[in-house]
Amino acid sequence: MDDHPRLGLTVDASGCDEDNLCWSGGVLVMVGADEDWGGLVARAVAEEWAGMELLAGLGGTVGEVVAGNGAAFGQQVADVVWSVRTWDSATASKRTFAMAECNFGQETSRFAVADGERGRYDVLEVTFLLRDGTLSAPVRDEALAARLGVPVGSRLELAPARDAVLGA
């Protein structure tokens, strides 16, 4: 349980919850904004939830990475966000944004704020739509493909793809 400094609320951000959409080949994973991004990616790989394995090297919390639309090796967070639940400080209420409403751009989103500033929306929880499977997204980054010794466009097992990104 973490105390939310702006709201005077206690927010339980311990872990994530999943909703398996096996009929569609996807899984919705709901994660608290204060969870560690690297831990989420590690869990996704272990659970065989594909779509964020090439983002393993991004640092920070889930909320921070989503607000900055973290990107690496041809993947970006916006590719796997389903929705973002926030606290709207202007209306003093919770508000959920569908991915299309998040205004994702290169390393930015509706939730990004400049250093030292307060934004209107505090990210509370993010729901990701990941693929249920063992293969990575196609490797689009030439340097990563060369490091792995595979052609651009190849798909890899999730763990080796994550390990290559982390330099293991």
Where does each model-flagged region fall?
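Anion-binding (especially nucleotide phosphate/pyrophosphate-binding) glycine-rich loop
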Residues: 1-91
